[in-house]
Amino acid sequence: LDEVLVTELGQFGWYQARNILLAGIAIISSAFFSEYVFTAAAVPHRCRIPECGETSKSDIFEPEWITNAIPLTGSGSLESCERFVGLGNGTLDYCPASLFGQAREECEEFVYGLDISVAYDFDLGCRDWVRALSGTVSSVGTLLVLPIIGYISDKFGRKIALVISVFNLALFGVIKAFSVNLTMYMIMQLVHTTLGAGIYSSAFILAAEMVGPKYRVLTSAIQSSLFASGQMVMGLIAWGIQPWRYLMLALYTPCFLMVSYYWLLSESVRWLLSKHKYEEARKVLENVAELNNTTISEKSIAALMSPTENSQPKEDKQSLVLRIIRSPILLRRVCTTPIWWITTIFVYYG
């Protein structure tokens, strides 16, 4: 196929540019899975003081009497997780220092300075580990998605895998925005990444495979850069839309439009050839030639669709496993690449 791209179809033309653009939009959206950085962000919080008439987590964060009830940190801000022990009862308007001793105790209830995060809606208070768990669950999902998307890509095609992934990205992202409790939010976080985080790999393949060897490295660099650009886009949106539910709706609702890729993108030619779908592969190749204003000869099409190279008997799974075990190079790669991947995930996501 590379030889045909170089000599006939063109290494880079309108077809390749269109694929990179469409796949690039999908890759940008794949960066939105890191939205938990904003949706589960820490917000200012302090102990709720029922002795002073406070009854809600949305009470005024810094009333005039607050330093009578809550100690200050070394930087002059209110302690987030401790308060002075109460000795009597006051009101929201009058709560003097005489109602509190100097001994400290941990908070049981909280008042929040902002209502833009999961921490406020689900009253997480000082349970920072719960907020961090959101990112951990997301990372687990990115691990679980690999065999799932791999199976779908091999069985049904790269385009189908991409369309399913972007649909799941949009659907479960919107559902997550309507989470009614912490349990639902965490489950949706796991389902969201497990069923939707295969976007990057599928889009990357569709963008790069029909680009000629001369431009393939550049295309790969562009796709990787677009993922980073997606994180910047997400940051800008989060800057303008801070309430976490609205932020998620703003990020994921437009992603439903990418379901149209089922009609806009062509299936992977290499996959079609590997599955002996020769007529479909021919149509894609002719479409490439038409958009690039080039031609492809019948001889080249016949060579690509010749079953000669596929006529060799296939090895069964057991033979393939034994072949890997007996090859020092393959065995070393099989053992080390998972470690590289896991290490990269820990380093990248912290």
Residue ranges of each PLM-predicted region?
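Helix-to-loop junctions at the C-terminal end of transmembrane segments
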Residues: V145-G157
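Central mid-sequence intracellular linker of multi-pass
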Residues: P44-G101, G240-S311
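Helix-breaking motifs and short loop linkers at transmembrane-helix boundaries and internal kinks
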Residues: G157, F178-T183, I241-Q242
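Glycine-rich segments within core transmembrane alpha-helices of 12-TM secondary carriers
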Residues: A26-S34, V137-V145, G196-L265
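Hydrophobic core of transmembrane alpha-helices in multi-pass small-molecule transporters
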Residues: L114-D115, Y120-G125, M184-G198, P254-F256
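Flexible cytoplasmic loops linking transmembrane helices in multi-pass membrane transporters
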Residues: L1-Q16, P71-W129, E290-G350
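Structural signature of the two symmetry-related core transmembrane helices
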Residues: I160-I175, T183
